[in-house]
Amino acid sequence: MCPLQLRTLLFVGWVVGYVAFLLSIRRMWTGKYIRNPVVRSLLVNMLSDLDTIDVTKWYRCNPDLLEESLRPLFIQNQLDADTRAFVEQSEEKSTYLFTQIYYSLVSTILSPLVSRTSINGFLGRGSMFVFSKNQFQQLLQIEPDWVADRLLDLGAGDGGVTKVMAPHFTEVYVTEVSLTMKRRLRKKKFKLLGIDAWQETGFKYDVISCLNLLDRCDDPLRLLKDIRQSLVPGTGRLIMAAVIPFQPWLEIGGRWERPREYIKIQGKTWEEQVNGLTNEVFRKVGFEVESFTRLPYLCEGDIARDYYLLDDAVFVLKSSDDQVAAP
């Protein structure tokens, strides 16, 4: 057997072994082969149909743990039709076995070289869900026909969440680091700005969204100050989503590194971390909370899970100097 044939045989054997491993992982994640009853219960809960799990915990807040000034600002949400549709679509996609095997194989090969975001952009997968159209309108306290001039979505990813907000704005601007995600944003006709150019355009934005970006930023306080300076005075608003617990890390070339400016938020519960973000971050840079809510931060799944879920705190922030009512 020549060296080329041997290498080919070894590669085919590796692929077959890898596929078999993925199938066994998928099988084990069903919970049948997990002996520990606590772990098994947790995994079954994460993979179960929406009708069989308690989704109210995705939105639950204990107001007694919030500081007094924040309590009347909390907006209670619940599972709605758009959120359900995203989860059900993710569950369906996770059953496409050969597609998921292909995704997993490509991710394994590329992950040492490029970020997971870029891999997802290349594969056309990994869409995120932060809020529905109705939840966005309720959070910003606007009517369905409300329209403003400019939206800027920082770190827009594939533009899925941008698309939810876009109908309320005449012009939609986005930023993104990943080259593959940039291509997807251009296909959706959003106006792409450089990551260091959006605050130097010569105009202000009515709304800037910074969704699950603050904990992936090397200089988060500087970012917040730049956002504050870039909003329309008086009526401009920042929509800020942060994963709770707040744990800042940067993904660089497939590696995770600690940011230069590290923010540590005190508190163990969702409510205590909301208090911490408000007092230790937002107020320090000149923002105050106008409204906030608890929402699930959802991502399309893979061969192991139907979908991924993190706890989000989503805020509407205004400049502390603003004396004008909300839009």
PLM regions: where:
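A conserved beta-strand element that flanks and buttresses the S-adenosyl-L-methionine
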Residues: 209
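Conserved acidic residues
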Residues: 149, 170, 206
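N-terminal accessory regions of S-adenosyl-L-methionine
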Residues: 2-147, 160, 242, 250-327
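Conserved beta-strand signature within the Rossmann-like core of class I S-adenosyl-L-methionine
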Residues: 235-244
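A short glycine-rich, Lys/Arg-flanked "PGG" loop and its adjoining helix->strand segment in the class I
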Residues: 222-236
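A short His-aromatic
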Residues: 212-216
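Class I SAM-dependent methyltransferase SAM/SAH-binding core
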Residues: 152, 157-199
